[in-house]
């Protein structure tokens, strides 16, 4: 399991706030169609986010990496990748997942780490 040794906080929540040094975010498997996970580190740190096994169809669902808090306009949409890494410019990063109603839940996971 590639999450061995990493903090796994209440798997499958639809949104949460993470402030730990590192951890894993799993997709939400319930009925909600939009989820926001915000990662916020101490001001001196940035965030390295590793995205694994994203195979979304962007017409029906999407995963968006937002630089900063949820209301920030600087974002990148991810549709299909087996592995990608993103480093924040600030100490805050938000991940937004949206899907159309009745579209099946995804099977991705995200690993975040605090970096200087």
Curated annotation (Swiss-Prot):
Database matches in CDD domains: CUB
Location(s) in or outside the cell: Secreted
GO cellular component: extracellular region
Tissues with expression: Seminal plasma.
Disulfide pairings: 14-35, 58-79
An individual GO BP term: single fertilization
InterPro entries linked to this entry: CUB_dom, Sperma_CUB_dom_sf, Spermadhesin
Pfam families: CUB (PF00431)
Secreted found in the keyword field: yes
Residue ranges of every copy of the CUB domain listed in the record: 14-115
Coarse class of the protein's main subcellular location: secreted
Keywords: Disulfide bond, Fertilization, Secreted
Domain of life per record: Eukaryota
Protein role: May be involved in the fertilization process.
Subunit and partners: Homodimer; disulfide-linked.
Similarity section: Belongs to the spermadhesin family.
Protein name: Spermadhesin Z13
Species of provenance: Bos taurus
